Amino acid sequence: MRKGNSLHRNLDTIFGNEVYSNNLTHQEFLSVRNQHLWEKLRDIPLYEAVHTWLSSLTNHTSRSYRGSILALERIGLISLKMPLQQFALLNHNIILDAIKQIPTTVVCWSEGTKQVRAACYISLTKFLNRVTSGIISIAQPSHQESNKTFYKIRDLVKTNAMNQVERVLFLEELSKINYRDWLIAQTILQGAKRVTEALSVTTDHICFENGVISFNQIKSRGVFKTTIITYPQKFMKLLQDYVGERKGLVFITKKGRGVGLKQLAGTFAKAGIKAHIPFKVTPHVLRATAVTEYKKMGCSDSDIMKITGHSSSKMIYAYDKSTIADNASKKVSLI
């Protein structure tokens, strides 16, 4: 997918002086404008528009949607080489339905994967609808009961969580493989942090005296949210020794750069194998483990939300790994 940033430039320059200099009625103006825009769409390939769209998203969403778009091209639902004019002529609702109804003989996608691909396609058409002043239509999800595009697949998150013994063994093996990544794992665990939050934390957000680290989250619509996590003094001493007199990012490579997610995921997976964890240990497994443990300890959802940054108790419940039988009736007798 070729990088380019000329989509907005092309769309911003489609109006010549002719449109403004002539004494046109509003209807005539709209007709001229749409014709200019339509002709310009012939010269803009879809891959260029996709790159501009992806650059407007968060890093995590951009990575996910880039993979989705490439997957849609691989199975022939779209072609990134087609001009936007041709893309505008497609029936996007049919493509959306095709994503949900793709047979396993073509590609084996889970329902969750299909819904991510569908959400990606809708997002792309919404973006293009806006920048083309409505010429490219928006793919509309189906709300028919028997053929809904989106519906809840599960109540609980699919991510596994380690128990106490597994957690200890994992950290022990990780400390032997990479000391820095061992510190990162503990940072994630204590604060139930997303891996991006842990990797982006800077030294000015640490108060060693009070044993706290502040984490910034970017929520929807660019809203910032701060969580303050208290860490054991033993850990803070190890972290202080690791940081030394450095300023900037807390966790860095030997070359002074930020730690890559791919590298960290590889180290975690390796430690999980050595610790004989029965599932792949990813950074998100540590977050799920933390929330699960806080729930087991009896912490209220509101307290856990202050740690994780979740905006509702429903999101906390999704991490509850306890059995259905482990409920209030086991602790209290009313008869």
From Swiss-Prot:
Protein's UniProt keywords contain ATP-binding: no
One term of GO molecular function: DNA binding
Matches recorded under InterPro entries: CB, DNA_brk_join_enz, Integrase-like_cat_sf, Integrase_catalytic
Protein family membership: Belongs to the 'phage' integrase family.
BP GO terms, sorted: DNA integration; DNA recombination; establishment of integrated proviral latency; symbiont entry into host cell; viral genome integration into host DNA
Lineage top rank: taxon: Bacteria
Keywords annotated in UniProt: DNA integration, DNA recombination, DNA-binding, Plasmid, Viral genome integration, Virus entry into host cell
Occurrences of domain Core-binding (CB) (ranges): 44-129
Protein name: Virulence plasmid integrase pGP8-D
Active site location: R194, K219, H284, R287, H310, Y319
Keyword DNA-binding found: yes
Domain Tyr recombinase: 155-332
Pfam family, one: Phage_integrase
